[in-house]
Design a protein with these regions (language model features):
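Divalent-cation
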Residues: 1-166
């Protein structure tokens, strides 16, 4: 399993899918090699729920992901991690690994978007099966530029993109 972080969420409107981009974490072994990224399509509501969790926004009343996290805490169990476990092209599958009161792990099947929404709400690590990254991932090159103007220009360009551009 490869540890990843959520790099970005590309929100789409209407019938177009949104994208969640997961990026491989840098390790001492990956200093010279380009890191890999995995893009997962999801609906706009799911992307918005994930974004809310990342931003820590309180919608006033708990949405489904907040309710589930609250229930897990009330029951005295813990979301230990999230795993993107396998794929049946083009569908990805995930497990939420829950640690019970005795320390035993339980894998609960979940959609990747839901699993990620839980992970960001409890700060749980996210992992992707190596085979999935090899088959469906792309290379994600980091730059060492400190030129804020160049970065701002690139950010503005990225915000003009839609899934149809790909």
């Amino acid at each position: 399993m490869i540890r990843v972080d959520i790099e970005t969420i590309v929100m789409a409107a209407g019938p177009h899918p949104s994208l969640i981009v997961l990026r491989e974490r840098e390790t001492s072994e990956s200093n010279e090699a380009p890191l890999r990224a995995l893009s997962i399509q999801t609906g706009s509501f799911e992307a918005a729920a994930l974004s809310q969790g990342i931003d820590g926004k309180n919608p006033g009343r708990p949405i489904t992901h907040d309710f589930t996290v609250n229930a897990v805490k009330e029951l005295g169990v813990k979301i230990a991690r999230v795993e993107i476990s396998h794929m049946e092209t083009p569908v990805f599958f995930a497990n939420v690994i829950i640690l019970d009161q005795n320390g035993k792990e339980h894998a609960v099947d979940a959609r990747p978007s839901d699993a990620l929404a839980f992970a960001v709400r409890v700060n749980a690590p996210i992992y992707v099966e190596d085979d999935i990254m090899n088959r469906a991932g792309t290379f994600s090159y980091q730059t060492d530029t400190n030129d804020e103007a160049e970065q701002q220009k690139f950010d503005e360009f990225v915000h003009t993109l839609s899934p149809d551009d790909f």
